[in-house]
Swiss-Prot record:
This is Bifunctional purine biosynthesis protein PurH. SUPFAM superfamilies: Cytidine deaminase-like (SSF53927), Methylglyoxal synthase-like (SSF52335). It comes from the Bacteria. The IMP cyclohydrolase activity resides in the N-terminal region.
Amino acid sequence: MTKRALISVSDKRGIVDLARELKHLGWDIISTGGTRLALEEAGVVTVAIDDVTGFPEMMDGRVKTLHPLIHGGLLARRDIEHHLQAAKQNRIELIDLVVVNLYPFKETICRSDITYDVAVDMVDIGGPSLLRSAAKNHASVTVVVDPTDYPLVLGELASTGSTSYQTRQSLAAKAFRHTAAYDAVIADYFTRQAGETKPEKLTLTYDLKQSMRYGENPQQAADFYQRALPITYSIASAKQLNGKELSFNNIRDADAAIRIIRDFKERPTVVALKHMNPCGIGQADDIETAWDFAYAADPVSIFGGIVVLNREVDLATAEKLHAIFLELIIAPSYSKEALAVLTHKKKHLRILELPFAAQEASEIEAEYTGVLGGLLVQNQDVVTESPADWIVVTKRQPNEQEMAALAFAWKTIKYVKSNAIIIANDHMTLGVGPGQTNRIASVRIAIAQATGQLEGAVLASDAFFPFADSIEEIAAAGIKAIIQPGGSIRDSESIAAADQHGITMIFTGVRHFRH
């Protein structure tokens, strides 16, 4: 009995060569619409789908493969006699191979000029149905959704006359992943269009971006996936100009770094980061000086760290970056001379280029945190804050220089692991106290790091001070300005301690925990 293949594809890469080989192996080919036209123009004889069903394609192609003579030929179990008898009685001929990929819904909705009606028309109905029917009956039917699998299938058909069960099972799993991902993108689009923010079902789809050597540690397997609908300002979308592949830890650190720099748009700024905590942030009127400040903030921790700059890297800055060991540099662009310097004798230095103009669009993306058996979803901590809404709760008011430093420190604090303390002036961080289980310990770490630079420095805390003991430590260090959310039942004690030591203190009313 002559074997039959059904071919209907949007992505026509390699389809003519596949069809020619199938014909050479003695297969009949059923095809539809544009696919059939492409094959016929290439000299491949096919059978029109409506010649099989007896019904013409109708409703602008919405109805063409949804027919018992097609799905019966796919779903009939070859090992069950009454299935075969039913097929024979109803003039259903078996179909042994399905080659289908779907209307380009994702690509369509990514275009800026697409209307809702056009998007709806790009929802494929018949294609997923064919794939699911064929994949369900993979014991007998081979289903192919990816042109890169054509050589595998043709090789087995040419060698043995059929595909192996292992191949059919693997391709069936791939087909189900394909249709699931396709439907997830559609569901996400319709959910957004309907304005729903808390759907009862959350379906996410990501595409494999990079197979990794290992995860956070060598004993952990890991891979890197990119959102099926990519966002531009993302490490997954960054252009790599030099260096080895990004590691698991590189990616996490780089993501933290580009989130921080996003809050510093107004002036040239450099962020140095290690283990997802900023170790130095500097801002100035030019990027070279901003780098000088970021480096001076902690020249020890920056060794082997990640640096992100929000302006083009020029030659002078590149020469300074080249002088120390860094894992990764990220910037919106690099001058030709700067790139030549950075890559000289540093083939392993990872250099990324990222479109900073797309920063704002990235702020609406949800954050997902996995827990055992569950997933936490939240908005990013990108609340708009204005110093006009802050309240000075002490007797002494901050002066202009202190106010600028407090605003700078407050931008920085939300990116430090809680309990978090930052000591800074108006252009650079001086001490970082991250991730301690009690706040006074973070205060002590930040003060110790900033020793010798505390003249005119200010301090920020990501959450309220539960006791006045931290204020006493801060006062003893000579710091005269504090910014914090407030909200403790003992706020009055902290305010009294600040007043006693002539410290000005601001309550912002906004907490910035980071775990």
